């Protein structure tokens, strides 16, 4: 079914504006038959953040911003889905065009600006599917016009705690002016303290929902030192490494798009984000697991992220170029690697290459 969907949809979607194609893809997923997914190889199961993931391959925030198709995505074989970014109030985001394909680089530039339906609408959808099971995380952010951005995060934690499998505190999008300033030490410490306090306030009624922090790949190593130290001291449950980058590699072939503002994702982000995974893994010293994201487009790329220090991985941009069949392909490659090397689980290789990667010259 997935192969047929890809064969039909990928050529068609390439003919459309990138954002229109994305909208059509979400609508198409909602129309797919409710086919029960094949069981995953038990060796791919991952225990992280107090949750049991059937496999390590998730879909990153940004694809299903408004929780319109989480169950369809789970049925397609993802081990978990992250919806959002959600803000307290609905917002339109930045003016179009704001999403651009770099086809020769298998990359995307976006400056979406947290366009979403707002907390009330997204909560209603998640509450309606609450009995469906599966791990569905909620990525939360601040409204562009907010006068108290920390209060936005706190309100979202309190609102979504009953329906979120986990939270991702997104302070790393480059498309909301000033948002990345929340990664600075004093601001981040205050934010995480208040977010964790909010989680504790609703613990009795909503449970102990894990809180993850998503960071930018553009941090310096000194800044990363501070971020990881604060994350550990505030006892966050994990980190997602990393968001899109503002950097533009001179190796990019799609030169006509180099001046487009926004975050770059896809294959050109792979090396930088993998280095950041390894650097974060070394600094975390086992305090919490990591989700690796950025440029994963094959089983080999997923394995590299895991060996750099990621317990789980997320995809998005590669799906635009390779289709939804990529999910099963990555899982099959990971299972084959475990079988070939005689290992019982992916946890045995998490971070195996981190010392080697971090010894390389910086910046990459």
From Swiss-Prot:
Q: What is its main location?
A: membrane
EC numbers, comma separated = 1.3.5.2
> Which residues are named in the active-site annotation?
173 (nucleophile)
Q: Which controlled-vocabulary keywords does the entry list?
A: Cell membrane, Flavoprotein, FMN, Membrane, Oxidoreductase, Pyrimidine biosynthesis
Entry superkingdom? Bacteria
Example GO biological process term?
'de novo' pyrimidine nucleobase biosynthetic process
What InterPro entries does this protein map onto?
A: Aldolase_TIM, DHO_dehydrogenase, Dihydroorotate_DH_2, Dihydroorotate_DH_cat, Dihydroorotate_DH_CS
Q: How does it sit in the membrane?
A: Peripheral membrane protein
> Which cofactors must be present for this protein to function?
FMN
Q: Which Pfam families has this protein been placed in?
A: DHO_dh
Indicate the enzyme's highest-level EC class: oxidoreductase
Reaction(s) the record says it catalyses: (S)-dihydroorotate + a quinone = orotate + a quinol
Cross-referenced Gene3D superfamilies:
Aldolase class I
- Residues binding FMN: 61-65, 85, 139, 170, 214, 242, 266, 295, 316-317
Q: Name one GO molecular function term.
A: dihydroorotate dehydrogenase (quinone) activity
Q: Which family does it belong to?
A: Belongs to the dihydroorotate dehydrogenase family. Type 2 subfamily.
Q: Its quaternary structure?
A: Monomer.
Instruction: Give the PANTHER family listed for this entry.
Output: DIHYDROOROTATE DEHYDROGENASE (QUINONE), MITOCHONDRIAL, DIHYDROOROTATE DEHYDROGENASE (QUINONE), MITOCHONDRIAL-RELATED
In its UniProt entry, what is this protein called? Dihydroorotate dehydrogenase (quinone)
Native organism:
Rhodopseudomonas palustris (strain HaA2)
Q: What is the lineage of its organism?
A: Bacteria, Pseudomonadati, Pseudomonadota, Alphaproteobacteria, Hyphomicrobiales
